[in-house]
Structures are given as C-alpha cells and as structure tokens.
Amino acid sequence: MRNIIISIVFLLGISSIQAQTVKEDLSEFPETMLSDMDSLYWDWQSKNLIYLDENCRMLPEGPKVSDSVYIDRLSRIPSIIEMPFNEVVKKYIEAYTGRLRNKVSFMLAAANFYMPMFEEALETYDLPMELKYLPIIESALNPKALSRQRASGLWQFMLRTSKSYGLETNSLVEERFDPQKSTWAAVRYLKDLFNIYKDWHLVLAAYNCGPGNVNKAIRRAGGSTDYWDLYPFLPKETRGYVPGFIAANYVMTYYCEHGICPMESQLPAVSDTVHINKDLHLQQVASVCNIDIEQLRSLNPQYK
C-alpha cells in the first residue's frame, strides 16, 4: 500500500541597476498584497505560533528613502535575476515598507520555517536563490492560500498545472497545500519555463499568467522579448508581478533599514516524517506521537 507521509515536529524552539520609465497606472497589485491574512489557518498561526517580540520596537512608519538609495541597495542584492529600479518598482517597495509593514513582519517570522525548504529545492535544480521570495507575492507565505481564480498553496498552482507536475487533488488530500511537494513541483515548473524563455522576467510573468499570455504579449510587442516592452500588453495583475518580486527581494533584505521588526516564531526549526501504511485519522497520529492536533494540522495542511 502506498505510504502516507506526515510531518511531525521536534520542538527545538524555534545586476546592473538602471532607472527605467514605466507608466505607473498600468500596474495592479497582486491579490496577496491586497488581501488580509484572515483565513482560519493564519488566525490560528498568529494566535499560537507567531507573536510580537517585546524587545523590538517597530516604527509606525519607515524613513524616507531617496531613489539613489533604492538603486544602490538593489545593486547590492546578490542576484542573477535583474532588479531594475523604476517608478513601478518604487511603488511596490513603498507599499511593503509602508502600509504592508505589519504583513512583512508576519512573513519574516514564517520565512524562518519555509525558506530552508525553498533554498534546498532551488539549489538542487541550480536556479537563482532569489526565487525563494516568489511565494511572498504568490501567497504571502500562507500554505492554504486560495485565490479568486482557485490557484492554491504557497506557490499558487492552478489545478491543471499542478497535475502536470505530479500533485494530487482528491477528496482526502490537496497536495497544492503541501509545502514540500508544492515547492519541488514549483521549482521544476520554473526550470521548464526558463528552458523556454531564457529570461527570468519572462519566466516570472509566465509563471503568473501562463505561457500563452506571455506569447501573446510578445506578438503584440512586435516580437520583443524585453519584459518592459511587453509590460503594457500583459494581463493587468501580471504587470505588477515582476515589480512586486523585486520589491519582495528588497524588503526581505532591507527590512531593518525601514524599522520593521520580524515577529517571533514558535514554528518548528526541525520536523521529521512518519510513514503510515494504512488509513488513520490525524487525531490518532497526534495521540500516538503526543502532539497537539492543531499543530499537526498546521504542519500537514494538505490533508482535508
């Protein structure tokens, strides 16, 4: 019989930059930047696993930053993917460091748990490490995120794409919610997209809106494969996707300079797996392993 893998927690505590001109009004914030973290999952996480650090005083607003400082800071981020600065990128950076600063604080805590698994998969497939911040704009690091278009999980897979990469969805399991399996599937998908486009900005756009829409934008842009030439021909939300990705890399690197404190996290520093060869209820597993059932559910969000 096929083994079922359940995560169990060990509670151990826890390129050159160029200023470009792009019309700002063509951009739209990705859905996760506009939505509140109000799902039952994040409600439980925030009440039980993530909390404010009493020793860190987060400023209500960050300092004013000049364009030249933004350009300099972006140039110092070690990256293979180009991170240009323009007015659209600036708008996204100021959103993350301004009205979304509490969300950033929350994501910094969750990142301690998720980033190691992202980094392992990216290193295995020899992909740019800065892609580990893609789920920041995809799902705000919510493994049970569900978009209006029914994209699901940390990496926001649509059902058809997820099945192409071996993720299972049925009455008992939704593997798009599985942090490990969805991460490895997403990295394989990104690798395949790069083999098609050979340009990381186009890969990011295709990941968000699909290769068909990117190919259509290329035709409408007269055959150009420069992302900023394609920009006005992309779907509205995708126009803000690359700027949002650049801003996510910026804020996850320079949050201290903007007076943003990471929340403290009791998410496990290390987890392990138990292989089960027959049907069991999670409550049975929790009882045998002496683990709180809600924590077990949070570590295994793929099970319905």
Locations of regions flagged by a protein language model:
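Bacterial Sec-dependent N-terminal signal peptides
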Residues: 1-24
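An acidic, Gly/Ser/Thr/Pro-rich helix-cap/linker signature
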Residues: 18-125
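Extracellular LysM carbohydrate-binding repeats and other cell-envelope/extracellular binding modules
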Residues: 234, 299-304
